[in-house]
Amino acid sequence: MGKVYIVGAGPGDPDLLTIKALKAIEKADVILYDRLVNKEILQYAKEQADLIYCGKLPDFHTMKQETINRFLVKYAQKGKMVVRLKGGDPFVFGRGGEEAECLSENGIPFEIIPGITSGIAAAAYAGIPVTHRDAGSNVAFVTGHYKKEEDFEEKWKALATGIDTLVIYMGIKNVQQIERKLLENGRDGSTPAAFIHWGTTDKQKSVFCTVDTLSETVIKENITNPSLIVIGNVVNYHYKLEWFESELKKQDLSEAL
């Protein structure tokens, strides 16, 4: 019997990969990886490893979750060391829990290797601390995508005014609903907000607005996935603490000279 390692690849910058994740990738016989995994990380796999792309776009899956689960079980039963490589952290909106359940039910040994989630890392690369003693004593990590419409409606009632900082994953498609539900349930429309596109990578772009202009900003700035939404007064710290995109601009300028 082999073993499956459910591994977080981090938010995009390959240098944010953990040492334990790197060791697992180097030893793996089979690696099943998602779309948001930086392909540079795959260079650490051994030459004879099987690399299987499971890429998932919003509303379109190259490989269905049930198929991925079957592959994990099949390769482990063949005695392989399997790495299931997922962007960010596998247990933060990454279906890692579902995959671990499947392995447990089938008697497959497994291990979880956490990764740095984009909700913290992308915000940090945009100069936004998700908590701050003067602006945010609590934070909620939220998915903007729900299996059931009624779940979407109900959750936002609690989130609108009870949480200082909202970090929203997969929220672009439903941004109009998010804006509407926050405003309907008492969130101040002037609350600062940020979109962080391709956070921690050389394609990172941060766009700033307010809660009452979320949906129009998506259209105006042509914001697409993968993008993180951060809402709360902590967003204003960007103007003091921004560092990464300034470095990218300096690099672009030096290369142009």
From Swiss-Prot:
Q: What is catalyzed by this enzyme?
A: uroporphyrinogen III + 2 S-adenosyl-L-methionine = precorrin-2 + 2 S-adenosyl-L-homocysteine + H(+)
Say which domain of life the source belongs to.
Answer: Bacteria
Q: Which GO terms describe its molecular function?
A: uroporphyrin-III C-methyltransferase activity
Q: In which pathway does it act?
A: Cofactor biosynthesis; adenosylcobalamin biosynthesis; precorrin-2 from uroporphyrinogen III: step 1/1; Porphyrin-containing compound metabolism; siroheme biosynthesis; precorrin-2 from uroporphyrinogen III: step 1/1
Query: Which PROSITE patterns does the UniProt entry name for this protein?
Result: SUMT_1 (PS00839), SUMT_2 (PS00840)
Instruction: Give residues annotated as binding S-adenosyl-L-homocysteine.
Output: 11, 87-89, 117-118, 170
- Belongs to which family? Belongs to the precorrin methyltransferase family.
Query: Per its database record, what is this protein's job?
Result: It is a step in the biosynthesis of both cobalamin (vitamin B12) and siroheme.
NCBIfam families according to UniProt: cobA_cysG_Cterm, PRK06136.1
What's the protein name?
Uroporphyrinogen-III C-methyltransferase
Tell me what organism the protein belongs to.
Answer: Bacillus subtilis (strain 168)
